[in-house]
Regions:
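Mid-domain alpha/beta scaffold segments of enzyme catalytic cores
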Residues: 1-136
């Protein structure tokens, strides 16, 4: 949360905010988010790898570490995950691979996913369908 994280929380609480969701965008950010989670204080975490950072995530190397994070108390979602075909900071096939792995992880753990979608509507819907998502 940075140097003034406590001040930010205090101002938010004074304004009536009672719950916070801290999202991870890399494996390291997700570790930080999970460490900040304190359900008794209304602080929760989402762990994930943003599509810009997908190039740095290898499921075979990082998957067990990530899944252990996702199982920690106070982690309530997988995210921010998805596809970003506007900037292409990570190759599109890699973005899709990581998204589908993260969706599988969310399904295994029974957690919702926080999705990022930029200029990838058809592709993200196809990935969701491949991973068993359905309309309610």
């Amino acid at each position: 949360m940075g140097v003034d994280g406590s001040a930010l929380l205090s101002r938010a609480r004074a304004a009536g905010v009672t719950r916070f969701l801290v999202p991870g965008t890399t494996l390291a950010d997700s570790e930080d988010a999970a460490a900040l989670a304190d359900p008794a204080a209304g602080i929760f975490a989402a762990v994930g790898v943003h599509p810009h950072e997908a190039k740095d995530f290898e499921p075979a190397r990082d998957g067990a570490r990530f899944e252990a994070l996702a199982r920690r108390p106070g982690v309530v979602a997988i995210g921010e995950i998805g596809l970003d075909f506007h900037y292409d900071h990570s190759p599109r096939p890699k973005q899709i691979e990581v998204l589908e792995w993260m969706l599988d992880c969310a399904a295994r753990l029974g957690l919702p996913a926080l999705l990022h979608n930029r200029e990838s509507g058809e592709e993200i819907l196809a990935a969701l369908e491949r991973r068993g998502a359905r309309e309610n």
